[in-house]
């Protein structure tokens, strides 16, 4: 159907830019959508968690020299997503998992936050980007990537990435956990077919070839993400004119609360932020038999999500700074690990409803971790992918959206609260805190920090 739209628009006597705009307008009109609510947000059902309809988008933009013209994008390699049998039998190498955990927590203190002090990103998505870059590079550039990740060989990284992908992959109405990748090449760029096929098999990446002109590349990638991220928000793709090569990696996550929040228990309270102190709405519930940890530096607990994943909430102790925890990757990893295995008890949660979008430059994160030659046009080595010279990584940006709210109505007979005859602890997130979504095998899927809370619009 998409090709029909393209052909119809191409027959009209318009400039390429106007053709692209008309094509997208036709697609928006012709493509069926799920029913949105009055605010344009998607409804996933009463018991669906809208803790995070999260989408993390990573882009690697590589400098260009020349551009040729071809009509539309052509697929080069296409992945086949894991079957139920493949996910059921998937295994991940322990050394790779240990390296990924260390890498993930080390990034937390290196990510720049927005003007409001808040941020959310996917270290897992970052790791897939690194694996893709490693396969496309060689020499010193590849060595820097492997060293930053803590592995010795490309095979360890690519095979580990592939194994974990199959282990984590789920795509059902109740639970979505999927990383999506694509590689976009300008029509003038030479390429190694075997490398692109390896990206399809190991990182499950699509690859396309098209002219990077008249905004077509940015529009094509935006369309691709709209179709593959399963997210109701439009994802804007930055594009620098003159680029030859673009790597795009995103992470889509949707889950359910294991024990639901109900709207009747939501209340208004004060959040004391670093720059804003004011009222906001708090979700509230009591959960029975959940891990609870108290240390000199932080209090932490978790809320179970479907699919075996967990939302870990970490509140620094009074007088302690959030940066003290985030800037110490080993400390953050220790708190998460101890929380996951802490003694279980009853905990009352008060969690502010937050919603924000962030775009961060993760090239600076990689630079702080020792990956520098990929961004230096005199040293970058992308010879594994292309025989062209002068190719280097110009920019890496990651965009993410976060919604944290109950968004659930209590059904008759449905469990809403836990109860206990023993002692009960509380975790009131009324000042800056951080959160981590971890998979069943304790891989950090998303990391975020909340320093200031703005009231959600009703």
Predicted regions and their residues:
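Short Gly/aromatic-enriched secondary-structure transition segments
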Residues: 145-149, 261-269, 324-331
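Disordered, charged N-terminal biogenesis/targeting segments of membrane/secreted proteins
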Residues: 1-42
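Extended hydrophobic
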Residues: 247, 299-314, 420-457
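Detector for small/aliphatic-rich hydrophobic stretches
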Residues: 3, 50-56, 65-211
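N-terminal export and membrane-targeting signals
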Residues: 41-52
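Non-catalytic, conformational "gating/processing" segments within enzyme and secreted inhibitor domains
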Residues: 77, 88, 116, 154-317, ...
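Single-pass transmembrane signal-anchor helices and their membrane-water interface zones
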Residues: 17-30, 50-75, 417
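Internal alpha/beta scaffold segment
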Residues: 316-343
């Amino acid at each position: 159907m998409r090709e029909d739209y393209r052909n119809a628009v191409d027959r009209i006597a318009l400039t390429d830019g106007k053709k692209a705009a008309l094509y997208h307008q036709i697609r928006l009109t012709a493509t069926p959508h799920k029913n949105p609510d009055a605010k344009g947000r998607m409804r996933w059902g009463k018991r669906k968690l809208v803790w995070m309809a999260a989408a993390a988008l990573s882009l690697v933009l590589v400098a260009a020299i020349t551009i040729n013209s071809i009509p539309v994008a052509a697929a080069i390699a296409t992945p086949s997503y894991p079957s139920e049998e493949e996910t059921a039998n998937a295994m991940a190498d322990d050394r790779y998992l240990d390296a990924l955990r260390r890498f993930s927590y080390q990034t937390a203190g290196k990510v720049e936050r927005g003007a409001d002090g808040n941020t959310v990103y996917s270290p897992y998505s970052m790791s897939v980007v690194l694996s893709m870059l490693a396969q496309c590079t060689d020499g010193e550039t590849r060595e820097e990537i492997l060293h930053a990740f803590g592995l010795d060989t490309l095979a360890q990284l690519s095979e580990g990435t592939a194994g974990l992908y199959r282990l984590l992959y789920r795509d059902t109405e109740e639970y979505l956990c999927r990383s999506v990748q694509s590689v976009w090449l300008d029509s003038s760029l030479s390429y190694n077919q075997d490398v692109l096929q390896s990206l399809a098999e190991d990182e499950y990446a699509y690859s396309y070839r098209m002219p990077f002109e008249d905004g077509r590349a940015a529009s094509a990638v935006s369309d691709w993400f709209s179709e593959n991220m399963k997210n109701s928000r439009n994802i804007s793709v930055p594009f620098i004119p003159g680029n030859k090569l673009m790597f795009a990696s995103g992470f889509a996550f949707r889950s359910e609360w294991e024990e639901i929040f109900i709207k009747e228990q939501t209340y208004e309270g004060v959040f004391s932020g670093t720059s804003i102190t004011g009222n906001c709405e708090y979700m509230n519930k009591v959960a029975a038999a959940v891990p609870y940890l108290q240390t000199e530096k932080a209090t932490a607990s978790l809320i179970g999500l479907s699919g075996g994943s967990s939302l870990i909430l970490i509140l620094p102790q009074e007088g302690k700074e959030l940066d003290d925890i985030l800037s110490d990757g080993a400390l953050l990893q220790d708190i998460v690990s101890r929380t996951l295995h802490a003694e279980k008890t009853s905990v009352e949660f008060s969690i502010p409803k937050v919603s924000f979008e962030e775009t961060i430059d993760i090239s600076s994160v990689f630079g702080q971790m020792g990956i520098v030659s990929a961004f230096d046009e005199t040293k970058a080595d992308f010879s594994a992918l292309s025989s062209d010279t002068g190719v280097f990584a110009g920019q890496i940006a990651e965009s993410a959206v976060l919604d944290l709210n109950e968004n659930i109505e209590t059904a008759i007979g449905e469990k809403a609260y836990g109860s206990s005859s023993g002692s009960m602890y509380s975790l009131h997130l009324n000042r800056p805190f951080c959160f981590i979504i971890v998979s069943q095998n304790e891989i950090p899927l998303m990391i975020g920090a909340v320093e200031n809370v703005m009231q959600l619009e009703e």
